[in-house]
Amino acid sequence: MLGEITATYHEIAREISRRENLLIVAPEEAQPIINCQLSIINSNDTWARDHGFITLTDDEGHHRLLDFCFNGWGEKFPAELDNAINRRLYDEGLPPLSPADSPPRAGGQSGKYVDCLDFVLEGGSIESDGRGTVFTTTGCLLAPHRNQPLTKTQIEERLKLELHAERILWIDHGNLTGDDTDGHIDTLVRICPEDTLLYMGCDDPDDEQYDELRLMEEQLKTFRTIDGRPYRLKKLPMPRPFYDGDDRLPATYANFLIINDAVLCPTYAQPDLDAEALRIIGEAFPDREIVGIDCRSIIKQHGSLHCCTMQFPSI
């Protein structure tokens, strides 16, 4: 298992580092690769999306590094090491952001650290269009052991405050079987250019996820852009079921990663469905190369491409 998933991470690292700088957090030194910086920090797990900084950038290029509390998806798993990574990186002058901010940090880098550790929020639980709208799911943000006793209204106001959002669109259906996160939106619905939403669908009425995904689709049809127009909806196929013993795994094509000039897309050795998913994603990103990454080894850990990465603004 370790060798299999290590090979997958190597492939992801190569594809990213070909196009942009890469920062890897690891517990020990490793052989360097081009455009890659290694930071030696212990962690509980590999899901950088959920404990990494959420970065806001204004029109003048100033960055705000939001450090929210990560508590192992509602205290399901240990998280104390993961929850300390952001502060450690910041003290080391990482991530390497634009010098537009002041004062500069260690190593001459910059960016304003914002302590949001009194509020639980995972990066995989939100999607933003960069124009004032943030999408999230009620299943995740209102789940026990995250931000109780805060109400939905109080949580929404905090999201608007910290993320500088004008509105929050809540998705009430769609949690995938085997998803430990209580319904992260990055497994279900992704925002793409031209007000396009790529979302997971299911055409098999006998599939246990069929009803929830159908209800999610119906809700998405009611959503409007901040300008009052319907979103352009594109449905992604559902991979045929993966199991770990008797447990179904949350395989999804929505967990793709947008990088410079490319989109890295999870595949599952299902040529027909993989090709269909890559075609649909390619239609949403016509100016980017679409690169498939076999993520069968990662999905065995109940995550995928987007889950194990977190982007930062370029220098």
Give the ranges of each region predicted by the language model.
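The feature marks the mature, well-folded catalytic cores of soluble enzymes
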Residues: 1-101, 111-315
